[in-house]
Design a protein with these regions (language model features):
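Structured, active/binding-site neighborhoods that engage oxygen-rich ligands
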Residues: 1-290
């Protein structure tokens, strides 16, 4: 990081990195790193893939459900021309989500949330009806909220906890981890931002017990790692859950891995995407954040 990078370039790099990382990681989403290694060695390119067993073979570079969420937030921000709240993004859902999206570019629980969004339920209450309050569904897609609050970490935190209520319960674990994404992006847009300044902002603005304690533990535990092969082995003893819905997609795991990659690779977007894609488990979401 650092150097003479314009704010426009930072915006572009953030969104491009999330899109490309998601598209590359979607190919091997849910795989073990041993399976990735056996088939690709190091996966470092865009390939076709299928999701949801629906017969749609997506062309290389096609994004997935997380980026669809992000696009809706971007659209709401563009249409308002300012920071957005949960109601603003709900209106974007109602205007732009197509009925055929369910099972194609969105998770099953999102169809339920959309149906409720069409009622009189306040936008801030919708997330109460999602069964998966710790998921990374918002943490991996909330980049635009950090960007519209460029340089303002407090504003980013406030808006993450506001808009995120569309997906998860107020102040819940998933939203507290999404604050990491928003605050980090807001901090990274500052002039002369560095990896250390971004990490410092995360530690200053994120929940001390629910978030910072785990991040600090894993940053220290993986400090010796020099590449993604060392990093993924280091995570094995901590993040290894199977046998339950979305077992690989909880926000604490995905965000922590992304932050450790960011630190290890000194904020290099391309290298971070490749590392995340080859880490195994929820590869597309890790790549979107890293």
């Amino acid at each position: 990081m650092g150097g003479k990078v314009s704010l426009r370039e930072k915006f572009f790099g953030c969104i491009a990195g999330a899109h490309i990382g998601s598209a590359m990681g979607a190919v091997v989403e849910g795989w073990t790193y041993d399976k990735i290694e056996e088939k690709y060695g190091t996966l470092d390119k865009l390939l076709p893939y299928e999701h949801y067993n629906n017969g749609w073979i997506r062309e290389p570079g096609t994004t997935e459900d997380g980026i669809e969420r992000q696009k809706l937030m971007i659209t709401a921000i563009i249409e308002k021309g300012d920071r957005v709240n949960a109601e603003d993004v709900r209106q974007a859902w109602l205007k732009y989500i197509k009925p055929e999206s369910a099972g194609m570019v969105s998770e099953p629980f999102e169809a339920v949330l959309l149906a409720m969004a069409k009622t009189g339920i306040p936008a801030r209450d919708l997330g109460r009806y999602c069964d998966y309050s710790g998921l990374n569904s918002f943490a991996r897609s909330c980049h635009p909220i950090g960007l519209i609050n460029a340089g303002d970490m407090e504003g980013a935190k406030e808006d993450i906890l506001e808009v995120g209520q569309l997906y998860q319960t107020t102040n819940s674990r998933g939203l507290q981890w999404a604050v990491v994404t928003g605050v980090a992006i807001a901090a990274a847009t500052r002039p002369n931002a560095t990896v250390d300044s971004v990490l410092g902002a995360i530690f200053d603005y994120c929940h001390a017990d629910m978030v910072v304690k785990e991040l600090d533990r894993e940053l220290k535990r993986t400090a010796h790692c020099k590449d993604f092969r060392e990093l993924r082995k280091a995570f094995d003893s901590v993040y290894n859950g199977y046998g339950m819905p979305y077992s690989m997609s909880y926000a604490n795991e995905v965000v922590t891995k992304a932050v450790c990659i960011f630190r290890m690779l000194d904020g290099n977007t391309r290298d971070a995407m490749i590392a995340a894609v080859n880490l195994g488990r929820d590869t597309d979401c890790i790549a979107a954040i890293a």
